[in-house]
C-alpha cells in the first residue's frame, strides 16, 4: 500500500505533435487520459518544465537517425507510412524524453508511482529508427522508456521493463538486446505489427534470458494475462526486487480499442497496478487510441492505490481455459529458465 497518490507528469508541449488530417496518434490521446484520471480522483498533475538535449537522445539513437528526425521535423513530413512529423514534433519528442527521465528520477527517490504522459510514443523506435526489421516506426520518434532505463542503470544493478502495450516493443528490445542488466518483459498480440517478439528471441550472446517475450493469441482475456503475470513476471520481480519497475504503459490491448484484437478490461490493468504496489513505478505512456485510454489508465492507478482490496476480491486465475496461452507460458518458462534460475 502506498502513502500518497500517484503523480502524473505532464507538459503541454507534447500536444504540439499534430497530424494534418485524422491520425489515431493525435493530441487528444493525452487529453483523454488527463480528463479520465481527473474524473476518477487522480488529479496530482506535476508540470515538468523543459526538454532533453540532442546529446541525451544520442545516448540511445544513432546520429544519422536523430539528424534525420531534426531535418524532417522542420515542416510536415512522414518518416514512413505510419509516422508523421510536423514543425513542433522535435520539441514534443524532446519533452516526452525528459518526462520519462524525470519520472524515473522521482520514482528512485520515492517509492510511489509516477506516470509520464509522453507523446509521441517511443517503444518501436530502435537505435536507427525502424527496429528488428519492422516496416515502420509505428508512430514513435525517440524511445522514451529506453532513456529512463539508461538513467536507471546508474542506480540499479538490474533494470526491469514491463511492456504491456499490445504491440511488441521492438525498439526497446533492440536497444537493450546485448545488455544483460536490462530485463525486458513484453506482453503483446502475436502476428500483428511489428511482427517481432518470438519466445525464442531472448537477447544477445551476453544477455540471453533477459529478453522475455509473451506473444498472446488474438482475443486473449484478463485471465490469460493474469495467469502469465503470476507465472513469469511475479517470480522475476520477487527475485530481483528492483528499486523501481519501469512500465511501457500502452493501453491498446483493451477490448475494442481499435488497432488490435485483445479482450482485456479494467480488471487486468487494476491487477497490474495492485501487483506493483510494493514497488516504486516509472510508467511511460505508449499506445492506446480510443476506449482503452478512458478506462485503463485510471484502473491501473486505482489498483496501485487500493492494492489489498483489489487482490482480496480478485477471481481465481490459477486455472485458465486457453491451452494456447498455457503452452506459451510453459515454453517461455522452460526457455528462460535455462538462463535465469527463477522458475
UniProtKB/Swiss-Prot annotation:
SUPFAM superfamilies: Arginase/deacetylase (SSF52768). One of its GO terms (biological process) is epigenetic regulation of gene expression. It comes from the Archaea. Keywords: Hydrolase. Pfam families: Hist_deacetyl (PF00850). Transmembrane segments: none annotated. InterPro entries: HDAC_PDAC, His_deacetylse, His_deacetylse_dom, His_deacetylse_dom_sf, Ureohydrolase_dom_sf. CDD domains: HDAC_classII_APAH. One of its GO terms (molecular function) is histone deacetylase activity. Belongs to the histone deacetylase family. Putative deacetylase. This is Uncharacterized protein MJ0535.
Amino acid at each position: 500500500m502506498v502513502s500518497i497518490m500517484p503523480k502524473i507528469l505532464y507538459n503541454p508541449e507534447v500536444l504540439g505533435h499534430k497530424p494534418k488530417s485524422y491520425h489515431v496518434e493525435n493530441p487528444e490521446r493525452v487529453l483523454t487520459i488527463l480528463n479520465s484520471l481527473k474524473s476518477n480522483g487522480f488529479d496530482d498533475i506535476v508540470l515538468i518544465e523543459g526538454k532533453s538535449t540532442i546529446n541525451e537522445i544520442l545516448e540511445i539513437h544513432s546520429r544519422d537517425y536523430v539528424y534525420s528526425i531534426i531535418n524532417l521535423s522542420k515542416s510536415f513530413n512522414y518518416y514512413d507510412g505510419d509516422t508523421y512529423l510536423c514543425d513542433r514534433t522535435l520539441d514534443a519528442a524532446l519533452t516526452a524524453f525528459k518526462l520519462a527521465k524525470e519520472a524515473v528520477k522521482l520514482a528512485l527517490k520515492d517509492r510511489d508511482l509516477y506516470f509520464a504522459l509522453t507523446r509521441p510514443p517511443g517503444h518501436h523506435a530502435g537505435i536507427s529508427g525502424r527496429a528488428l526489421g519492422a516496416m515502420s516506426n509505428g508512430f514513435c520518434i525517440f524511445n522514451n522508456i529506453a532513456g529512463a532505463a539508461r538513467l536507471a542503470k546508474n542506480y540499479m544493478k538490474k533494470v526491469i521493463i514491463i511492456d504491456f502495450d499490445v504491440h511488441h516493443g521492438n525498439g526497446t528490445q533492440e536497444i537493450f538486446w546485448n545488455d544483460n542488466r536490462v530485463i525486458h518483459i513484453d506482453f503483446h498480440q502475436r502476428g500483428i505489427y511489428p511482427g517481432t517478439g518470438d519466445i525464442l528471441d531472448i537477447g544477445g550472446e551476453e544477455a540471453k534470458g533477459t529478453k522475455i517475450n509473451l506473444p498472446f493469441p488474438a482475443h486473449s482475456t484478463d485471465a490469460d494475462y493474469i495467469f502469465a503475470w503470476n507465472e513469469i513476471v511475479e517470480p522475476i520481480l520477487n527475485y530481483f526486487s528492483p528499486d523501481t519497475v519501469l512500465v511501457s504503459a500502452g493501453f491498446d490491448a483493451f477490448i475494442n480499442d481499435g488497432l488490435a484484437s485483445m479482450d482485456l478490461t479494467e480488471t487486468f490493468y487494476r491487477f497490474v497496478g495492485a501487483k506493483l504496489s510494493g514497488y516504486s513505478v516509472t510508467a511511460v505512456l505508449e499506445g492506446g487510441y480510443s476506449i482503452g485510454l478512458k478506462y485503463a489508465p485510471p484502473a491501473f492507478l486505482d489498483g496501485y492505490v487500493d492494492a489489498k482490496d483489489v487482490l482480496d476480491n480478485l477471481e481465481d486465475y490459477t486455472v485458465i481455459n486457453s491451452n494456447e496461452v498455457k503452452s506459451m507460458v510453459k515454453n517461455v518458462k522452460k526457455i528462460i529458465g535455462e538462463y535465469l534460475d527463477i522458475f
